[in-house]
Amino acid sequence: VTKNYISDLTAILLCGGKGERLRPFTESLPKALVPLNGEPLLAHLLRYLSTAGVERFIVCVGYKAEEIKKFLREGAYPEREVTCIDSGDVSMTDRILDSIEHVEGRVLVCYGDTLANVDLASLGQAHRESGALATLTTYSLHSPFGIVHFDDSKRITSFDEKPRLPYWINIGFLLCEPEALKFLKRGSDMPEFLSAMASAGVLYAFEHAGKHITVNTEKDRARAETEVIEFFTYMNGEAK
């Protein structure tokens, strides 16, 4: 996949959520502007995608939209085309539908509360090779606990410290052909959109093995505060 393949994408960032589990931060800020290591979560996401080669962004806002609009006006993104769309208090799919009126070609749909150093070139290559209408980035679930293995006599045979489980979770970074967006329906939500594509056999998975965190709670935010430095390393203008 060439660099042009990535630069031709439009990234749709879903940043309209209230983030009720992140209070008191979200009493005065939208979830996407919750600080991580001195910068808003949205700043980290925009920087990573920009460094990876994405040049056009649509930021979908709702809760405390004016705060995000102000951040984008003051942000240092002169070489990037950033459009802000305020749909109010609606579902994610309605936000995407309002966004696609402003784009042509492929889109990359990202959750505004999720950081991951996804290799967009590899995602694009997997998407092209599969012939999918949409490719969803997935992440292997890890047990938060150490696992004990024992035999029928209850004799302990081994331990696994927080092992990887045989399950994969949806972390966004959803690469869509224009035809995939026909599965969107107003008033529905993301699970229905994804399930409709899965039922039609046009949705494929991309396995992300790098860094990932979704910031839903203060515990998540505190963990991300220490990990975000490791997430994104910038070398020679490329995201690693």
Question: Regions from the language model: what does each represent?
Answer:
Residues K18, D113-T114:
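Active-site metal-binding loops of divalent metal-dependent hydrolases
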Residues L22, I68-L72, A224:
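Hydrophobic packing residues within well-ordered alpha-helices of enzyme cores
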Residues S130-S140:
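A short, conserved acidic/glycine-rich loop-to-beta-strand motif
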Residues L108, L115, G124, R128, ...:
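Catalytic-core segments of class I nucleotidyltransferases/pyrophosphorylases
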Residues L42, I68, S99, D113, ...:
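Residue-level signal for inorganic ion chemistry
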Residues L33, V148-F150, A205:
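A structural signal for short hydrophobic beta-strand segments in well-ordered beta-sheet cores
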Residues V1-E27, V202:
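N-terminal nucleotide-binding beta1-loop-alpha1 segment
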Residues V1-L13, P35, E39-Y111, L120-S122, ...:
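Conserved N-terminal catalytic core of the sugar/cofactor nucleotidyltransferase
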